[in-house]
Amino acid sequence: MIAVITGASGGIGRETAKILVSKGWKVICLQRHDCDVEGTQSIKCDITNQQDIDRAFSMIDKIDLLINNAGFGVSGCVEFTDMREIRSQFELNFFAHIAVTKAALAKLRESKGRVIFISSAASVFSIPFQSFYSATKSAAESVSLALSNELKQFGVSVCSIRLGDVKTGFTAARKKDFAGDDVYGGAIARSVSVMENDEINGMKPEYVAQKIVEITQKKHLPVLATAGGTYKLFCLLQKLLPASLVNKIVGKMYMPEK
């Protein structure tokens, strides 16, 4: 069985690759830097570059599992965040995953394989000053749901796996744009601090990777799944409670007063 993973040089992607290798999978990692997990094959690929994607997939004969994992965060308020930063986040977190998936689909149809989008609880909870990250995850989930129906006739399954806070290098790599923080009374910095503290104290990537692999191996792949019991509860409450109340709770959590 052959798995292709984007963004496996560290964090969740790296741990997922390790588990799959231990289970006898051949794992191909697509990223700009080599994956140091023993037993994996690395193909250097900037997944925001279509030529790189085409070259990478021309080197792959078969795919049973595609895991769209690469991504990064940009924090900042809607009003002052530079449009170039917003577009760059959509390029990697959304458009690149669509391009990679499109390139893999012919081979996935042949194998009746599976497509996984690594999503976030932020897709259903629009977090203040993280709005564009939330938007990229929500957009990818929408495509994932439609794709699931489109590919059903070919025996290809599609799932978005929502994650909560995870302790990885994602936190340090986040681009923080504090432009306008004086106008917003320091709310941007306070909100980002809350987010980073939650991540630093979040789930271990090894645990999350194990949950991801467990979900990918289910006989009947769900179209949506959540890793971690607490976040499953949060997502359930989001369905049951009025949207205005959910949004108010999120605001209280991520916009602490001075």
What do the PLM-derived regions correspond to, one by one?
Residues 153-222:
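SDR active-site lid
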Residues 77-78, 82-87:
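Substrate-binding pocket helix/loop in short-chain dehydrogenase/reductase
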Residues 9, 17:
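N-terminal Rossmann NAD(P)H-binding glycine-rich loop of SDR-like oxidoreductase domains
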Residues 101, 136-139:
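Active-site helix of classical SDR
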Residues 38-51:
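Rossmann-fold cofactor-recognition segment
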Residues 120:
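Residue(s) in the substrate-gating loop at a strand-loop-helix junction
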Residues 69-74:
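Conserved NAD(P)H cofactor-binding loop of Rossmann-fold oxidoreductase domains
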